[in-house]
């Protein structure tokens, strides 16, 4: 059901270069660009997940400027896309928020640049999203990817965007746009 698709950009817990669990920094571009993609594809919400108070404060100030301040008058379409953004400390908070809105836990789609056992194709993911009545949450990682603890609670693992490439290091903004397009594409426009 395309009306219940959400995306979350995870900054904690994230794998560090050495495999340890870290928090990554939120970037202005990730907030803006993924929000614009989410709005373009009519997603129901976009979550920024960071456990760092300073990062939360920075994102909150930025959102206030673009939603309510001068930015909302200067660039109304940006303000519209940023209305989709919710800031949460942990993935559990995101799941609780979606469950409070939708009445049930979402199906979780795990994404990775790495090929994993039992991953599903984008075509299969698209079919699941269209056919399910449940809400869907697409998880995007930062740093060196989402950790196993998130993999373990996920319902599906999507195939990598370019599994066979000798260079597979897209920005999360580019990956988000490609993943969302492959899963939703023009299906949303054609449902009427």
Swiss-Prot record:
This is Uncharacterized protein TM_1570. To A.aeolicus AQ_054. InterPro entries: Alpha/beta_knot_MTases (IPR029028), RNA_MeTrfase_C_dom (IPR019230), tRNA_m1G_MTases_N (IPR029026). Pfam families: Methyltrn_RNA_4. It comes from the Bacteria.
């Amino acid at each position: 059901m395309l009306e219940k698709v959400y995306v979350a950009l995870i900054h904690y817990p994230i794998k560090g270069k050495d495999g340890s669990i870290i928090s990554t920094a939120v970037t202005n571009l990730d907030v803006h660009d993924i929000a614009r993609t989410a709005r373009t594809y009519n997603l129901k919400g976009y979550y920024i997940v960071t456990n760092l108070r300073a990062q939360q404060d920075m994102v909150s100030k930025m959102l206030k400027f673009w939603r309510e301040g001068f930015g909302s008058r200067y660039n109304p379409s940006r303000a519209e896309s940023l209305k989709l953004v919710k800031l949460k400390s942990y993935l559990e908070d995101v799941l609780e928020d979606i469950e409070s809105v939708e009445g049930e836990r979402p199906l979780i789609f795990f994404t990775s640049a790495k090929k994993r056992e039992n991953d599903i194709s984008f075509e299969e993911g698209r079919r699941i999203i269209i056919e399910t009545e449940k809400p869907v949450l697409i998880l995007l990682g930062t740093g060196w990817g989402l950790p196993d603890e998130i993999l373990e609670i996920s319902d599906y693992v999507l195939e990598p965007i370019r599994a066979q490439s000798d260079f597979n290091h897209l920005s999360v903004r580019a990956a988000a746009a490609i993943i969302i397009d492959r899963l939703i594409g023009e299906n949303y426009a054609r449902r009427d």
